[in-house]
From Swiss-Prot:
Gene3D superfamilies: 1.10.530.10, Periplasmic binding protein-like II (3.40.190.10)
GO cellular component: cell outer membrane
Name under which the protein is recorded: Membrane-bound lytic murein transglycosylase F
Entry's family note: In the N-terminal section; belongs to the bacterial solute-binding protein 3 family.
EC number assigned by the record: 4.2.2.n1
Keywords: Cell outer membrane, Cell wall biogenesis/degradation, Lyase, Membrane, Signal
Catalytic class of the enzyme: lyase
Transmembrane domains' residue ranges: none
Catalytic activity: Exolytic cleavage of the (1->4)-beta-glycosidic linkage between N-acetylmuramic acid (MurNAc) and N-acetylglucosamine (GlcNAc) residues in peptidoglycan, from either the reducing or the non-reducing ends of the peptidoglycan chains, with concomitant formation of a 1,6-anhydrobond in the MurNAc residue
Signal peptide (from-to): 1-32
Residue numbers annotated as active site: 314
Biological role stated in the UniProt entry: Murein-degrading enzyme that degrades murein glycan strands and insoluble, high-molecular weight murein sacculi, with the concomitant formation of a 1,6-anhydromuramoyl product. Lytic transglycosylases (LTs) play an integral role in the metabolism of the peptidoglycan (PG) sacculus. Their lytic action creates space within the PG sacculus to allow for its expansion as well as for the insertion of various structures such as secretion systems and flagella.
Region (LT domain): 270-519
Gene name, Swiss-Prot/TrEMBL: mltF
């Protein structure tokens, strides 16, 4: 998978160029007939989306997602409340714009020329590529020329439709594919993972997240270069909304918010390990149920699933684990640490988990207050692994190299340098296995993603079994405190990949789902 990145330079250039063109619209707060004034008079920013692990979803009592956090921040920027409408497919999203039922679409939508002819695109904030996937163990296609009739199915409205049409016309005249009128990219990927469908196409971000829960899904081919992802609004002679978006994205780019969100949601999508992920999910089924009550009991300040992920990284949930260096137990505590915490038996599961949780809390309390709240845990974990003093050295080295010592994205890049003489010889606390601390934190983040997604999917499967005739419930209007469906579910919650084809009709085939109430 290609490295994911936010297009900071592109955002800056676009902002500079378009700000000139949109300058008359920038003082939008004083105009009564523009869209920003209408939003502020209404007191609500209306955003339509599709629930995915990257865009917006609810896990427990917490709302998450890159587009959710950006939407909430933009609503705060405008001084209004946020109203989210969840739709089933891409076509319904653009219908919301056409019918003036939404101010913005924030759903991981790919920018393309066809869409730009009918809708106003906002700043580009990350990029994806389109990839064909297959099931591990089945025949991997080496090129589109090897695809036989009936093997490739894509979701309606997917941007791959236009890509495939161009490839068929230019290079693969015998290429055929099917557009399923009912299933989303999410559901098609699930069918591929289960072996009931040969191939489908999704975007690289969607695939990387899906693999954390279904490691048997693998990438066969790259079908496109990196494609920009953006928000969309209605085209209008009034440019106040576009001007406000440009100013907002420029502001969060300059203050570091955009970089922090990139690190949070896109900073751990590479280096997928099939064997490791599969082993982890097997342990979730076979070992975790016995330990889960203890993780829930002692994870007072962090998500219990994160504490469980830390323990798996430390010991693979083996309460008898012992390393050559003398650390032992589920949380692999040293003898001195255990004594300082009042523990009498490091091999006792409850003592180890409670001690590890308290030690981690102590590390978090030492992280400088200037570090953003949501990133403090990663600094604490690095300190947990290599020692607090070496974490301070990593921050100092980051600042010396003109990076941001309060940004985990910046600091983690310097961790491997702590084991290189030209760097550690000039640091206060000297040599450290910084490369191990880097891998340690990244592995924990990946395990947490897998665990959250896997457990959410199991919950949905159990609910579906108890209520087989699930009533379709779209559209759903929510606030940040409202109900939000799980994005990892095999139920029709919407596709992971929202890279739909352009055009005013929005999708290749008409919708087959009807809203529960008129819009």
């Amino acid at each position: 998978m290609k490295k994911l990145k936010l297009n900071y330079l592109l955002i800056g250039v676009v902002t500079l160029l378009l700000a000139v063109a949109l300058w008359p619209a920038i003082p939008w707060s004083g105009k009564a007939d523009n869209r920003i004034a209408a939003i502020q008079a209404r007191g609500v920013l209306r955003v339509s989306t599709i629930a995915t692990p990257l865009t917006m979803y609810r896990a427990g009592d917490t709302m998450s997602g890159l587009d959710y956090e950006l939407s909430q921040a933009f609503a705060d920027y405008l001084g209004v409340k946020l109203k989210i409408t969840v739709r089933q497919n891409i076509s319904q999203l653009f219908d919301d714009l056409d019918n003036n039922d939404a101010d913005l679409l924030a759903a991981g939508l790919v920018y393309n020329e066809a869409r730009s002819q009918h809708y106003q695109a906002g700043p580009i904030y990350y990029s994806v590529s389109q990839q064909m996937v297959y099931r591990v163990g089945s025949l991997r296609p080496r090129s589109l020329a090897s695809i036989k009739e009936g093997q490739l199915t894509i979701a309606p409205g997917h941007v791959a439709q236009s890509e495939l049409e161009q490839l068929k016309a230019s290079k693969y005249p015998d290429l055929t594919w099917r557009v399923d009128p009912k299933l989303s990219s999410n559901e098609l990927m699930l069918q591929v993972a289960q072996g009931t469908l040969d191939y489908t196409i999704a975007d690289s971000v969607a695939i990387s997240l899906f693999q954390r829960v279904h490691p048997q899904l693998a990438v066969a081919l790259d079908l496109s270069d990196e494609q920009p992802v953006t928000w969309f609004s209605r085209r209008s002679s009034d440019n106040s909304l576009s001007a406000a978006l440009l100013d907002f994205f420029n502001q969060i780019n300059e203050d570091g918010t955009l970089a922090r969100l990139e690190e949070k949601y896109l900073g751990h999508g590479n280096d997928f390990d099939y064997v490791d992920t599969r082993s982890f999910l097997r342990a979730v089924d076979s070992v975790l149920p016995e330990l889960q009550p203890l993780f829930e009991k002692y994870a007072t300040d962090i998500d219990w699933r994160l504490l469980a992920a830390i323990s798996y990284q430390e010991s693979h949930w083996d309460s008898q684990a012992t390393s050559p260096t003398g650390v032992r137990g589920l949380m692999m505590l040293t003898r001195n640490t255990a004594q300082s915490l009042g523990l009498t038996d490091r091999l006792d599961a409850e003592q180890s988990i409670s001690g590890g949780a308290r030690y981690l809390k102590d590390m978090m309390s030492k992280v400088p207050e200037s570090v953003p709240e949501e990133e403090r845990i990663w600094f604490a974990l690095a300190a947990y692994n290599m020692g607090y003093a070496h974490m301070l050295d990593a921050r100092a080295l980051t600042a010396k190299q003109k990076g941001n010592p309060d940004s985990w994205s910046d600091v983690k890049q310097r961790l491997p340098l702590l084991s290189q003489r030209p760097y550690y010889s000039k640091l206060t606390y000297g040599y450290a296995r910084g490369h191990e601390a880097y891998a340690y934190v990244e592995n924990i983040r990946k395990y947490q993603i897998s665990l959250v997604g896997y457990l959410l999917e199991k919950e949905k499967q159990a609910a579906a079994a108890a209520q087989p005739k699930l009533v379709q419930s779209y559209p759903t209007n929510i606030t940040p405190q409202g109900l939000f469906p799980s994005p990892f579910s095999s139920l029709p919650l919407g596709p992971f990949s929202q890279a739909g084809a352009g055009g005013k009709t929005h999708s290749a085939l008409p919708n087959t789902l009807s809203p529960v109430s008129p819009r």
